[in-house]
């Protein structure tokens, strides 16, 4: 028997998106001791129950971290499973997280994340090709590994021990939580079979806005954990402006037109990410 879990999803979208999210959560194979929670982070939340899904009011700071903490306070389970609103979990997600049972010192379990194309735009194909949310990127972080809150499970006692998410953070709260858990003696365990599909961004504007938010998050992390991600040097920035256009031109001359475009998007993506480092990551501002 696996432990009781609480599935928590932060939400800040439109009503139609909420309907679709509830449908995806209803498809999970959940037991009678599990609860399915949507933490409604909109300015005017709509708390209540929709079938097996409870919508929890999470008005206040506009940040996923704030919403997840609000959901965690309502949760009953021994484990808190966090999935994002733009993901589609596999029906067996909850069972897969606990097969095999986690070790006693495992504080957080990281599931699989696969980008998928909803509308086959060039940008969506780029995101899938570059595997932007592949968990290997987070696990290979030069400071310390972490799991992404797009899909992870946290032991409730460990979560409460470290005080939950830094709820004023707009981004990078997942790395911060994982690093505080490791500082407290908890281990990370991978659960790649506990998988979700993540809907790839479909437009260049949406992708660049997302990356700018992530850039603000890593700059915030670097202030909290000095040296964890100091950003590129001026020499590295200058090198990009030369290498990426030359590489794109070379690919185009060989007839690899889509890959040439992808290389140019790489440059724009890096630029948005680095520009985002200049922005505040504080939802109170």
Q: What is each stretch, according to the model?
A:
Residues 23-33:
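Short, acidic, metal-binding catalytic loop of nucleotide-sugar glycosyltransferases
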Residues 38-48, 87:
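A conserved acidic beta->alpha catalytic loop
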Residues 80:
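Short aromatic/hydrophobic "clamp" motif used to bind/position activated sugar donors
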Residues 92-122:
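Conserved donor NDP-sugar-binding/catalytic core segment of glycosyltransferases
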Residues 112-113, 127-144:
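Short, flexible, basic/aromatic active-site loop/helix in glycosyltransferases
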Residues 170-177:
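Acidic donor-binding loop at a coil-to-helix junction in glycosyltransferase catalytic cores
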Residues 212-216, 228-285:
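Non-catalytic, C-terminal membrane-associated alpha-helical segments of glycosyltransferases
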């Amino acid at each position: 028997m696996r432990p009781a879990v609480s599935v928590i999803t932060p939400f800040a979208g439109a009503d139609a998106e909420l309907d679709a999210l509830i449908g995806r959560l209803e498809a999970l194979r959940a037991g009678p001791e599990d609860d399915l929670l949507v933490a409604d982070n909109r300015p005017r939340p709509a708390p209540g129950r929709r079938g097996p899904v409870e919508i929890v009011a999470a008005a206040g700071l506009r940040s996923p971290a704030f919403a997840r903490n609000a959901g965690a306070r309502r949760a009953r389970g021994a484990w808190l499973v966090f999935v994002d609103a733009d993901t589609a979990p596999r029906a067996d997600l909850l069972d897969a997280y606990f097969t095999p049972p986690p070790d006693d010192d495992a504080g957080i379990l990281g599931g699989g994340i696969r980008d998928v194309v909803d509308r086959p735009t060039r940008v969506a194909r780029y995101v899938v090709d570059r595997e932007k949310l592949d968990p290997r990127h987070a696990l290979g972080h030069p400071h310390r590994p972490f799991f992404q809150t797009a899909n992870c499970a946290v032991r409730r006692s460990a979560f409460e021990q470290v005080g939950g998410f830094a709820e004023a953070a707009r981004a990078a709260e997942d790395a911060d939580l994982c690093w505080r858990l490791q500082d407290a003696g908890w281990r990370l365990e991978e659960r790649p079979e506990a998988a979700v599909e993540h809907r790839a961004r479909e437009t260049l504007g949406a992708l660049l806005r997302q990356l700018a938010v992530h850039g603000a998050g890593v700059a915030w992390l670097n202030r909290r954990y000095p040296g964890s991600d100091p950003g590129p040097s001026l020499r590295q920035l200058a090198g990009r402006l030369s290498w990426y256009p030359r590489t794109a031109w070379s690919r185009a001359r060989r007839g690899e037109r889509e890959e040439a475009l992808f290389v140019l998007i790489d440059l724009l993506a890096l630029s948005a990410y680095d520009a985002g480092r200049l922005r505040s990551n504080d939802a109170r501002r």
